[in-house]
């Protein structure tokens, strides 16, 4: 009778030990699963973020920057300028009009409105290289060769400003399409700067 009790006690102890180990294993697995779940959640949240404040600022400010370039290009209509300058203005106007629509699409996709103050003369949000209302009025009043030289000089500064803005978002932005667009601005407007400098040299400006 005593031997039977001893055997039963040993059996109970063994069973209790097995249950304890199993419980610890389940707890560890649960903790690991919870940890993995949090990691996946964190990674998913990061993956969902495709743009940042630098991307938004760039697009909000580049839209009016481009719109001013289009406005300046339209000012050549009916003016007596060289064929090269006229062709350059036409290309700038067409290209940047398309790019404005593209950038407006980005803001709509992100659910972000265009900054109503961006690009306004005298405002802190005015894009780099943009002309003031007074400068545009002076350009409009110019005639002949003086107008062409002034237009090229202003567009040169305008392009340099756009490149500075583009380089900034390449360094700080995260949205792949915005970064690729900014890099294309650096290339295209860099080439146009070279062309403008050549035209100014020809005109003696």
Label each residue range with its predicted role.
Residues 4-17:
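Bacterial N-terminal signal peptides that target proteins for export
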Residues 24-28:
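C-terminal motif of bacterial Sec signal peptides marking the signal peptidase cleavage site
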Residues 20-22:
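Core hydrophobic alpha-helical membrane-spanning segments
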Residues 30-205:
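All-alpha RGS (Regulator of G-protein Signaling) helical domain and cognate RGS-like helical scaffolds
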């Amino acid at each position: 009778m005593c031997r039977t009790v001893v055997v039963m006690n040993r059996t109970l102890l063994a069973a209790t030990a097995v249950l304890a180990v199993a419980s610890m294993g389940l707890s560890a697995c649960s903790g690991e699963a919870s940890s993995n779940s949090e990691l996946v959640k964190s990674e998913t949240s990061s993956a969902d973020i495709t743009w940042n404040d630098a991307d938004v600022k760039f697009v909000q400010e580049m839209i009016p920057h481009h719109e001013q370039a289009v406005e300046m290009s339209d000012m050549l209509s009916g003016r007596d300028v060289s064929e090269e300058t006229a062709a350059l203005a036409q290309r700038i106007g067409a290209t940047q009009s398309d790019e404005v629509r593209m950038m407006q699409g980005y803001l709509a996709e992100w659910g972000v409105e265009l900054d109503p103050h961006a690009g306004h003369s005298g405002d802190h949000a005015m894009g780099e290289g943009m002309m003031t209302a007074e400068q545009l009025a002076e350009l409009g009043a110019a005639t002949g060769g003086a107008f062409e030289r002034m237009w090229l000089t202003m567009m040169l500064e305008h392009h340099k400003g756009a490149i500075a803005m583009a380089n900034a978002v390449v360094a700080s932005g995260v949205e792949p399409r915005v970064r690729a667009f900014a890099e294309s601005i650096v290339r295209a407007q860099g080439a146009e700067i070279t062309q403008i400098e050549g035209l100014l040299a020809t005109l003696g400006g």
